[in-house]
Amino acid sequence: MQPSALLLLGPTASGKTASALALARVLPIEIVSVDSALVYRDMDIGTAKPTAAERAACPHHLVDIVSPEESYSAAHFRRDALRLIGEIHARGRIPLLAGGTMLYFKALRDGLSDLPAADADLRADIDAAAARLGWPALHAQLAQIDPDAAARLDSADAQRIQRALEIVRLTGRPLAESYARREAAALPFRMLPIALVPSDRAVLHARIEQRFDQMLAAGLIDELRALRARYTLDATLPSMRCVGYRQVWEYLDGGDDYDTMRFKGIAATRQLAKRQLTWQRQFRDSWPGLVELDCLRPDLTNAVNTAAARLLTRSRHAAH
């Protein structure tokens, strides 16, 4: 019988952590984080990392596994997640892959494309253009040659804009076409996806604002000060491009005052949620069996528990 893996995906501030922990109280699960920020050690406040007590209540994987000085890619995630899912099944437990990094979910489901390697000369040209014109201008260039790719990227996301321009220029194809040319081996387990979606975007936005203010009150600025003192960091590292840290970095460097930093942090988090929901709409059309739940419903944890139980039961019946 093919084993199953539960998936819980949703935008930032949609209640994924609380729902995952509630599920752990009724099912023998282990949580595999699907979050490109939670992998970094010592970045706790700005990533809304599960607390020590929450992590003690249920095994968590792919949290605190790399230094903020290092990079962690979708390829790393797919390799690690497949290994962990196999190990969790071997222990007789159920993997729950929970998070909001939609590219990681897609990489797991579809495999990874055979993309061209980094080209040092082309990267140098792109970086020189960015230094002269700014990354928003390069984002606009990307929008002209590959509007779909540009729509998925923040205009200040230097790392991803650089890579997108590089791939499009090296291949002569839109990014989506390059990603479609992939070798995806059949997965040795069934994926049972649950997606959290807000019925009212304004309520999610209010939650995002409240949560960013809570992060500031909890010491996000001091956390980044400590990170800069402990590690050799710069603003271009993937860890420091994470929403919240990027805006506080500019504040600490004197580029923005406190109110501007707060405004930018909230706005960037809302933009992140918008991109996550764009991914989820695409999943809705391409992922048979995906269950959508309103993340604003007062009984969300019960609804997630019920949906998970139904998916697991259906999967068991389908296997016989």
From Swiss-Prot:
The coenzyme or cofactor needed here is:
Mg(2+)
Q: Which reaction does it catalyse?
A: adenosine(37) in tRNA + dimethylallyl diphosphate = N(6)-dimethylallyladenosine(37) in tRNA + diphosphate
Which GO molecular function terms does the record list? ATP binding; tRNA dimethylallyltransferase activity
- Binding locations of substrate: 12-17
What InterPro entries does the record tag this protein with?
Dimethylallyltransferase, IPT, P-loop_NTPase
Keyword Lipoprotein in the entry? The reply is no
Site, as annotated: Interaction with substrate tRNA: 101, 123
Example of a GO biological process term: tRNA modification
Coiled-coil annotated residue ranges, if any: none
Q: What is its EC number?
A: 2.5.1.75
- List of residues binding ATP: 10-17
Q: Which UniProt keywords apply?
A: ATP-binding, Magnesium, Nucleotide-binding, Transferase, tRNA processing
Which portions of the sequence form the region Interaction with substrate tRNA? 35-38, 159-163, 241-246
Pfam families membership = IPPT
What PANTHER family does UniProt report for this protein, alphabetically?
Answer: TRNA DIMETHYLALLYLTRANSFERASE (PTHR11088:SF60)
Q: How does it assemble?
A: Monomer.
HAMAP family per record: IPP_trans
Q: What does this chain do?
A: Catalyzes the transfer of a dimethylallyl group onto the adenine at position 37 in tRNAs that read codons beginning with uridine, leading to the formation of N6-(dimethylallyl)adenosine (i(6)A).
Family the UniProt entry places it in: Belongs to the IPP transferase family.
Record-given protein name? tRNA dimethylallyltransferase
| The organism of origin for this protein | Aromatoleum aromaticum (strain DSM 19018 / LMG 30748 / EbN1)
